[in-house]
């Protein structure tokens, strides 16, 4: 089993959970090996170079995928999916969902996602549009940026991950320190982002939001 890994702060709790889960060593090695940004893992899963990953939510809507109610979600604000004000339109090559979301929301400018976006927003939020905030303003709903998808063995992944949304993940200080240092962020900002902004359980409102987003994308020929 080959698992794709997105090495962003918002999935750090999941990485810690999987490291502690009693998986075969070979599986853990593969999970660490197949790293990539969302757009790369989208292609890797599509061509079955990996067996499962948290991929862009717009990509996860393909009928070929089996999905779990687990992903990257935010409500009212996300801080790490942005459009830079007063810039020319430009997609973030790391993303699929966020580029589509900017079009759905008719937000012009440069799309920026991930840890680099978080750093920029915290430095000067006035320069950026938070796309999750814009989505909530329009719909009153949360947003699902990515979703756990696989091509087979859904029951196995469901068994492995079923306790994750209910588990309080304790991230060792040295890991937080390393992530903060390598992203040029304060530890308190990393903690706030993980504790107060990002969550991973896809429930009824999140499913409603995702259906609405996919429908909007199809209307614009983005999906």
Swiss-Prot record:
The family this protein is said to belong to: Belongs to the MqnA/MqnD family. MqnA subfamily.
Mutant lacking the gene: phenotype: Cells lacking this gene do not grow on standard rich medium; however, growth of these mutants is readily rescued by the addition of aminodeoxyfutalosine, but not futalosine.
InterPro entries referenced in this protein's UniProt entry, alphabetically: Menaquinone_biosynth (IPR003773), MqnA (IPR030868)
Keyword Lyase: yes
Record-given protein name: Chorismate dehydratase
Assigned EC number: 4.2.1.151
SUPFAM superfamilies given in the database record: Periplasmic binding protein-like II
Gene name for this UniProt entry: mqnA
Catalyzed chemical reaction(s): chorismate = 3-[(1-carboxyvinyl)-oxy]benzoate + H2O
Keywords linked to the UniProt accession: Lyase, Menaquinone biosynthesis
Top-level division of the source organism's lineage: Bacteria
GO-annotated biological processes: menaquinone biosynthetic process
Database matches in Pfam families: VitK2_biosynth (PF02621)
Cited HAMAP family: MqnA
Phylogenetic lineage: Bacteria, Pseudomonadati, Campylobacterota, Epsilonproteobacteria, Campylobacterales
The keyword Zinc is annotated on this UniProt entry: no
EC top class named in words: lyase
């Amino acid at each position: 089993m080959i698992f794709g890994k997105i090495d962003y702060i918002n999935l750090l709790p999941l990485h810690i959970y999987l490291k502690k889960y009693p998986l075969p060593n070979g599986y853990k090695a593969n999970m660490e090996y197949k790293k990539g940004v969302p757009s790369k893992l989208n292609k890797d899963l599509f061509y079955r170079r990996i067996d499962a990953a948290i991929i862009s939510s717009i990509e996860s809507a393909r009928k070929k995928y089996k999905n779990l109610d687990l992903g990257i979600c935010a409500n009212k604000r996300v801080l790490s999916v942005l459009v830079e004000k007063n810039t020319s339109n430009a997609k973030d090559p790391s993303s699929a969902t966020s580029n589509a979301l900017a079009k759905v929301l008719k937000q012009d400018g440069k799309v920026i996602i991930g840890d680099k976006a978080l750093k920029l927003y915290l430095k000067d939020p006035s320069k950026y549009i938070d796309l999750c905030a814009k989505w909530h303003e329009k719909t009153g709903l949360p947003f699902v940026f990515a979703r756990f998808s696989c091509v087979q063995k859904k029951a196995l992944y469901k068994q492995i991950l079923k306790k994750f949304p209910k588990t309080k993940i304790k991230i060792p200080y040295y890991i937080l320190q390393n992530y903060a240092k390598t992203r040029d962020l304060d530890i308190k900002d990393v903690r706030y982002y993980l504790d107060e902004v990002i969550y991973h359980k896809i429930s009824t409102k999140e499913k409603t939001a995702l259906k609405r987003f996919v429908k909007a994308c199809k209307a614009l020929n983005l999906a």
